[in-house]
């Protein structure tokens, strides 16, 4: 009756799939019962003494004398009681026996691997007593140490299954008259949380064969291919079949036949033989983190290739932040190089042992299933500092003035950038039945040159836990999104991540936004759907790009013309402008008090004085006289005044390194929701805006403005590490939104004009021209005269209350558009009758 349980565990569904092949390999012949292997040996006329002299062969009659049933799966050496690995195997066996109940055996069956926490391993008494130098053993001899670890868990699982099978037989009253045979396949030991992390610049030739851990961004992922680790060869002379190992997947032929009497030297590979074993294989390229403090300016970021096998394949996509732990190995730089000297050149790569995905769609199912590999790690000192920052009385003022202290003024613009750094909460991200709603706000800064837009942009990217800074005039469309490249060696297509994918779950700063040309169209999908779709060369895929875009642009002509809309000043489409939550207009208007304080600030900065961080006493005087608009209604103490530093007040800005930790902690652990009062305040403001925009026959206010208000309000609560956004948060956001809208809706006279689309669709004075031409048509039909003098046209415009900055240019534009025809000096003929 033993055959009923052989190779199937104990018959309750656990480890049932271990008899069939997985991962592209063929385990069906390799994991057959041991007596079948003996029959195969006898059929081929093989002797036991000859087998003992061939330690590399998989078939061996010495299995019955080895206490570890999986010895041949992990070691090529012949088993000996004096082996130096026995003590390590026993120590690991004690460790896994004590922790076996903490592991999910079904998960081990599905993956063929087990996760081992390095920190728990070094703290275990059974390990430190028998292997006191476990850190050095794993670092200097990783292959043998991991083999000991794998054999130990193999032995523990084998004993556990045999015990359960025996208990099951006893319960059912069965007796097999002998020992229950259970065959467990190769189990990989995956070590994670390995310390210390090694920077890519420190990986040199001295690291060859060492066990290291690196962290970086995945920039390239290859296709999954089968890798042969054991090939069956048949002797051409006697027909004997042997399984020959192929270390590192390098194809080599056997040197001699295992039959002593045979002298055959010619062998044919048998790829379909049960003794041929293949694994899934994938190659990824890791780039050092852009936000890493160790990076050096002025050089290309370092990259290194990593090989993933078996269950590690398909554990990451381009743009993911991963922690790869593995063994440093070398490969030939150029296989087919014409120069013979290049045969001595090698390239370092990492044979991955574990991959912990910090983010991305694979983060939940990565090797570190319990989310150990988070985006940022916080020490106890960091947590104390974060708690002290949170305890500040006016936290928003402190954070805003710490963002970019060298730039004077622009408090509300800095507040908008700060809110973009913290971001809102993404909705329905894990619900496959709903469309996700983005939580990352986008900010656009438009203004005259020399007002510090680029410096504020660089400061925001520097403070962000994950920030990518690019310049629009040197960036291509594929450099922003994703590139499909072809591998020269294999001919396969591979994806290479661009700036938006590398900035996933972070900030992407784009300077010189107006000089990007046709690259604007590549941002449309990334800014709203927060993904990038690619359809090229038969490859159709989608990559995540959950990033906040902060852009800075200069107007056409070098100076912002308020007579034009934002679209006309930037030569940019309305589809792109409508995706920005906040659009700030920075104007260089002369102001004696402001200029005096600004000059003092610049001189103090150049002198290196500490008090130069005072951003303080700018008083912005708005020139709106009417109080009919909701945009002009201000509270008793507006946010812009609360953010300013009073004269003589000493400020202690937060260092960028600590502020980066604070922002990372808030984004990682705080997920605020709107309170009822906050939602009511936002709804009232939105409905009032809709009412005023409909009153003038235009509708520039859409639901995107309401979603922007919600996102920014959540970011305002997240800044103070609160789980609920209050009405005060909503009022602060409403004031920032008012400041943004005042710049986009104000005309050249400082009046609010809702007929000017916020997103700049169409000419700014188109409705004025239509109204003027309509009046001329009425007069011409009434007087039967379509000839007008220049002074008559000016009088008609005055009666219609049409205000333009330059009436002569206004008439000239109507002449260019074909509405009026110039018949002589100061004489025009109407052409629309």
UniProtKB/Swiss-Prot annotation:
Disulfide pattern: none
Alphabetically ordered keywords of this record: ATP-binding, Cell cycle, Chromosome, DNA damage, DNA repair, DNA replication, DNA-binding, Helicase, Hydrolase, Nucleotide-binding, Nucleus, Phosphoprotein
Positions of the MCM domain: 395-602
Subcellular location: Nucleus; Chromosome
Catalytic reaction equation(s): ATP + H2O = ADP + phosphate + H(+)
Binding residues annotated for ATP, in chain numbering: 447-454
EC number(s) stated in the UniProt entry for this protein: 3.6.4.12
GO function terms (MF aspect): ATP binding; ATP hydrolysis activity; chromatin binding; DNA binding; enzyme binding; helicase activity; MutLbeta complex binding; MutSalpha complex binding
One of the record's GO cellular component terms: chromosome
Modification sites for Phosphoserine: 623
Reported consequences of knocking out the gene: Mice are viable but are sterile due to defects in double-strand break repair during gametogenesis. Testes are apoptotic and contain spermatocytes that have persistent DNA damage and unsynapsed chromosomes due to defective homologous recombinatio. Ovaries are characterized by an early block of follicle development, and they later develop tumors.
Gene3D superfamilies: 2.20.28.10, Nucleic acid-binding proteins, P-loop containing nucleotide triphosphate hydrolases
InterPro entries per UniProt: AAA+_ATPase (IPR003593), MCM (IPR031327), MCM8/REC_WHD (IPR056875), MCM_dom (IPR001208), MCM_lid (IPR041562), MCM_OB (IPR033762), NA-bd_OB-fold (IPR012340), P-loop_NTPase (IPR027417)
Subunit structure: Component of the MCM8-MCM9 complex, which forms a hexamer composed of MCM8 and MCM9. Interacts with the DNA mismatch repair (MMR) complex composed at least of MSH2, MSH3, MSH6, PMS1 and MLH1. Interacts with RAD51; the interaction recruits RAD51 to DNA damage sites. Interacts with the MRN complex composed of MRE11, RAD50 and NBN/NBS1. Interacts with CDC6 and ORC2. Interacts with HROB; the interaction recruits the MCM8-MCM9 complex to DNA damage sites.
Its job: Component of the MCM8-MCM9 complex, a complex involved in the repair of double-stranded DNA breaks (DBSs) and DNA interstrand cross-links (ICLs) by homologous recombination (HR). Required for DNA resection by the MRE11-RAD50-NBN/NBS1 (MRN) complex by recruiting the MRN complex to the repair site and by promoting the complex nuclease activity. Probably by regulating the localization of the MNR complex, indirectly regulates the recruitment of downstream effector RAD51 to DNA damage sites including DBSs and ICLs. The MCM8-MCM9 complex is dispensable for DNA replication and S phase progression.
Family membership: Belongs to the MCM family.
Protein name stated in the entry: DNA helicase MCM8
Organism: Mus musculus (Mouse)
């Amino acid at each position: 009756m033993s055959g009923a349980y052989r190779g199937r565990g104990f018959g309750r569904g656990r480890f049932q799939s271990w008899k069939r092949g997985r991962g592209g390999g063929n385990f069906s012949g390799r994991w057959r019962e041991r007596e079948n292997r003996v029959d195969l040996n006898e059929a081929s006329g093989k002797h036991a003494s000859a087998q003992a002299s061939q330690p590399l062969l998989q078939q061996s009659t010495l299995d019955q004398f080895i206490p570890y049933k999986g010895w041949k799966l992990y070691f090529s050496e012949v088993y000996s009681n004096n082996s130096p690995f026995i003590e390590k195997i026993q120590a690991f066996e004690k460790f896994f026996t004590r922790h076996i109940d903490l592991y999910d055996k079904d998960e081990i069956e599905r993956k063929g691997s087990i996760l081992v926490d390095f920190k728990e391993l070094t703290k275990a008494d059974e390990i430190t007593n028998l292997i006191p130098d476990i850190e050095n053993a794993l670092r200097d001899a990783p292959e043998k140490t991991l083999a000991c670890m794998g054999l130990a868990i193999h032995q523990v699982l084998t004993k556990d299954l045999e015990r359960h099978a025996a208990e099951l037989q006893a319960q059912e009253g069965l007796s097999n008259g002998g020992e229950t045979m259970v065959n467990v396949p190769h189990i990989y030991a995956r070590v994670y949380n390995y310390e210390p992390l090694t920077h890519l610049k420190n990986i040199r030739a001295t690291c060859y064969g060492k066990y290291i851990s690196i962290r970086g961004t995945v920039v390239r992922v290859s296709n999954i291919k089968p890798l042969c680790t054991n090939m069956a060869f048949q002797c051409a002379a006697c027909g004997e079949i042997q399984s020959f190992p192929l270390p590192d997947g390098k194809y080599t032929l056997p040197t001699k036949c295992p039959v002593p009497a045979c002298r055959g030297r010619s062998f044919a590979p048998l790829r379909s033989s049960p003794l041929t074993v293949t694994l899934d294989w994938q190659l990824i390229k890791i780039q050092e983190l852009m936000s890493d403090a160790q990076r050096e300016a002025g050089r290309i970021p370092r990259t290194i290739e990593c090989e993933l096998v078996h269950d590690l394949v398909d554990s990451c996509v381009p743009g993911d932040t991963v922690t790869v732990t593995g063994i440093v190995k070398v490969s030939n730089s150029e296989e087919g190089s014409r120069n013979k000297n290049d045969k001595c050149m090698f390239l370092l790569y990492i044979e991955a042992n574990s991959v912990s995905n910090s983010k991305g769609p694979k983060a939940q199912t990565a090797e570190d299933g319990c989310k150990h590999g988070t985006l940022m790690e916080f020490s106890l000192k960091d947590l104390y500092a974060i708690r002290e920052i949170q305890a500040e009385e006016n936290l928003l003022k402190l954070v805003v003035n710490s963002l970019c202290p060298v730039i004077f003024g622009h408090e509300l613009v800095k507040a908008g950038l700060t809110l973009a750094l913290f971001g809102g909460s993404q909705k329905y991200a894990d619900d496959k039945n709903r469309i996700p709603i983005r939580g990352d706000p986008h900010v656009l800064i438009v203004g005259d040159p020399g007002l510090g837009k680029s410096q504020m942009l660089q400061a925001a990217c520097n403070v962000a836990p994950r920030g990518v800074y690019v310049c629009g005039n040197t960036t291509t469309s594929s450099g922003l999104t994703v590139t499909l490249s072809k591998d020269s060696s294999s001919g396969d297509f591979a994806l290479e991540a661009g700036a938006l994918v590398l900035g996933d779950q972070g900030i992407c700063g784009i300077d010189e936004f107006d000089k990007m040309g046709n690259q604007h169209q590549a941002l449309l999908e990334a800014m709203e759907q927060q993904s990038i779709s690619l359809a090229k060369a038969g490859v159709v895929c989608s990559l995540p790009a959950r990033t906040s875009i902060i852009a800075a642009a200069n107007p056409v002509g070098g100076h912002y013309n308020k007579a034009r809309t934002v679209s006309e000043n930037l030569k940019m489409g309305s589809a792109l402008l409508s995706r920005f939550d906040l659009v700030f207009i920075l104007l260089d208007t002369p102001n004696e008090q402001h200029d005096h304080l600004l000059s003092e600030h610049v001189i103090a900065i150049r002198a290196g004085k500490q008090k130069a961080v005072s951003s303080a006493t700018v008083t912005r005087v708005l020139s709106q006289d009417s109080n009919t608009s909701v945009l002009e209604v201000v509270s008793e103490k507006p946010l812009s005044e609360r953010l300013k530093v009073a004269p003589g007040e000493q400020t202690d800005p937060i260092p960028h390194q600590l502020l980066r930790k604070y922002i990372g902690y808030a984004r990682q652990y705080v997920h605020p929701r709107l309170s009822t009062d906050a939602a009511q305040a936002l709804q009232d403001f939105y409905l009032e805006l809709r009412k005023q925009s409909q009153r003038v026959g235009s509708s520039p206010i859409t639901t995107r403005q309401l979603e922007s208000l919600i996102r920014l309000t959540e970011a305002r609560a997240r800044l103070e590490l609160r789980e609920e956004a209050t009405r005060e948060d909503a009022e602060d956001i409403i004031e920032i939104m008012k400041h943004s809208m005042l710049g986009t809706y104000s005309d050249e006279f400082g009046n609010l004009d809702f007929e000017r689309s916020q997103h700049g669709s169409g000419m700014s004075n188109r409705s004025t021209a239509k109204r003027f031409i309509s009046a001329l048509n009425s007069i011409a039909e009434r007087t039967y005269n379509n000839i007008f003098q220049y002074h008559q046209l000016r009088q008609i415009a005055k009666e219609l209350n049409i205000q333009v900055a330059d009436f002569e240019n206004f008439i000239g534009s109507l002449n260019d558009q074909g509405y009026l025809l110039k018949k002589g000096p100061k004489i025009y003929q109407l052409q629309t009758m």
